[in-house]
C-alpha cells in the first residue's frame, strides 16, 4: 500500500482523488483534537507505522453522522467505539511525556535543597521542582 511505503512520492497518487493525504501534528491528540491525530496515535499505540486512513461516516441524506448516531451504529453492528477524549485520557494515563532532564544541589540559608529540571517532550516546555 503506497500510503505506508517510505519510498512513495506525491506523483504515486492520483490527484485529485477520493483519499486526501493528511499530516498529523507531532504530539497527536494531546496537541490537536483531530481525526488525523487520532488515526496516527491509534496506529502508534498498536505498534504499527503511524499511518492510516480515516473517514467520516455519512447518513443516507449525505450529511455527516454525529456522535449519538455513530454510537447507535456501533451498537447495531457490535463495533467498538471510542472518542478522541477517550484516546487522550488513555495516553495521559499510560504514557509519560515529562522527563527528568537535570538535578542540581541548591544550598540556601534555609537548608540544602535539590532542584530538578523536567521537559515535556511534546510541547518542549521546561519545568523546575525543588
Task: Report residues per predicted region.
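Catalytic domains of riboflavin
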Residues: 1-130
